Amino acid sequence: MSSTPVVTPDITGTLPGAVVPLATAGSSDYTPTGVRFDVSIGGVPFMLTAGKDTPYVRQTAPIQKPQFDVSSQAGEQTLDQYWIRSQASWHRGAGVKFYEPGNSTNARLWEPGAELITEHRFESSCGVDVWTRDQATLLYRTALTGASAGLAYVTTGKLADGTDCVFTNEAGVINRRTAAGASTSYTGGTAPLTAIAVAGSKVLAGHAAGIDVGDANGSTMAALWTIASGATVVPYWVKGRIIASIGPSLYSLTLTPGGAIASTNIIHTHQDPSWVWSSVTDGPAAIYAAGYSGASSSIYKFTLQDATTGTLPTLGQAYEVAVMPTGEQVTALRSYLGGYLGLGTNMGVRVALMDTNGNINYGPLVVETAYPVYSVEGHGSFIYAAVQEGIDGLTGVVRVNLGQPLPHEDLRFAYATDAQTHDNGVPSSIAFFGTTDRVVLGVTGKGVYTQSATLLEATGYILSGRIRYKTVEKKAFRLADLRARVPAGTVALSALDENASEVNLITLGSNAADGTSIGLTQPAGNHEYLSFRTTLTCSGDGLTGPTLQSLQVKALPAPKRQRLIQYPLNCEDRETSATGVKFGFKGYAWQRIQAMELAEENNVVLQCQDFTNGETFSATIEQSEFARTAPRAADGSGNFAGTLKVTLRKLA
């Protein structure tokens, strides 16, 4: 162990470096020597000169910055110091984990750190219609109207004798179901049936022996085309003709009875004998057929070519216009609105664009699913997809809004869950009652579910994205404002913490609809983020429900508080300690000032020791200020002297 140098009280010259260390300020401790210093900052020692004009100060570091409101949502930065997050519309759909809205239309107002595509979005929903701007209401409920133990296939609805209806295959029996609830069963068909299709005034049904046909307004089926046993025929009606898939081959047929389907009717046979044609649809310039084999899947187009006047155009050869990522299989196709193509796959839903040449460009997965999507349909400005166990683990429908593309995201659109069966099972097909927007869903082994025209879902919810105000620092969530119209039923608000623990905050009813200034005493403590679930419940008769208008959450930042400590330090070339020991040399004060300024400029983490109270901690220099109070010595020996105020931010 090294010995401590002996220092006599009357030394007036330069002292050894061991007594007055001048190393660069850093993280090392200062080892006391013969001089009893008061403070060491980064290993550089000082004497305190605390007094009335130069006090020693300890204070809490500020945690909020001055700000003014330039947000796209008025009041998002407020004068009462609350951090606010507001949501008054949900029309951009589900799928966000964090709700950090920016400004999607004006880049000048884009909030740093915000995600433009989260504005007016939420994490998930169930049983709620979010597509009307500035409100959310309950959807109409569905009910099982045709129980079936076998395949339940629903084809696109139409008007039959002026009545909205759909055609269903319920365990091998063709039924025509009307929006009013009436049902007509067809006789004479060949079972077991596969898919059915509507061809103008005719209804087509495929089976293992060919294709049957019946009048849309009738009740009997008869053979249209036949095949030898050993295959299954699936018919599609596109561009005024029947396209039928049989194994790896596609056939072009007419509505005129033609007897046995022959090889002359083939328009394309895939070279892979295990190829499965999963869907056929038509676009403005071509017919599209999708299929798969193993991990490979593609979409082919057949362009229309001029034929003899008065006859249908002929079909050109098959061109592969889209190849899916390895492992993703196209299981459903539906063209819509002349330019869009809805793709159902074993991984979810995509949207593609068709050009005037019949080529397509598909986008990313809009909706991701755990099971294949076997049916896609269009209605209004929406594409509907049947999803298995996709609504809180149960089967139903997801709706994609083609009129609401997400900002800065090519071919990604707003989506949300829609009609639900409240049961599980494999959905085989989706349709609508004629010209209405009432969903009809076929579920294999369960039957046909139809959406009511008057009865609302008993309950539904919207789960917000996680609100964290664009920072992972802890927040103290203080207040919530819930606005809703509640003529009947209730609106309840609950909060979920980082562990998904949920606590109810308030329930609004028709007699107690004031949801302003809800105290957020739960979940207890400070949090990085909270999510909020708003649950809507309809009246007992199911005819009236509440309307959600807005939700606003207020919080304050709650990081670990830091301490600012201001030390008034004596800084002279030559000083005298409290015990009378003289120390220093010419340039000693200037070297210590430079050491502090260098540490401040480089934001060095310093080890600080206060020998007056025994405190040791890590810190950075927040501010330094030197005031010279002595003139230069007449003999030129220096006398650089004054008070150095150093403000430290305590880190630990």
Regions found by a protein language model. Give the residues of each.
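N-terminal beta-propeller domains
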Residues: 2-185, 200-202, 206-218, 241, ...
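Non-cytosolic beta-sandwich-type ligand-binding/adhesion modules
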Residues: 5-9, 15, 20-24, 28-29, ...
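Extracellular ectodomain segments of secreted/surface proteins
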Residues: 143-156, 195, 456-475, 554-558, ...
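Repeated scaffold domains used in trafficking and secretory/extracellular systems
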Residues: 147-160, 189-201, 226-240, 269-284, ...
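Beta-propeller fold detector
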Residues: 184-188, 222-227, 261-269, 310-322, ...
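Blade-level signature of beta-propeller repeat domains, shared across WD40, Kelch, NHL, RCC1
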Residues: 425-463
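Extracellular/virion structural assembly segments
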Residues: 556-652
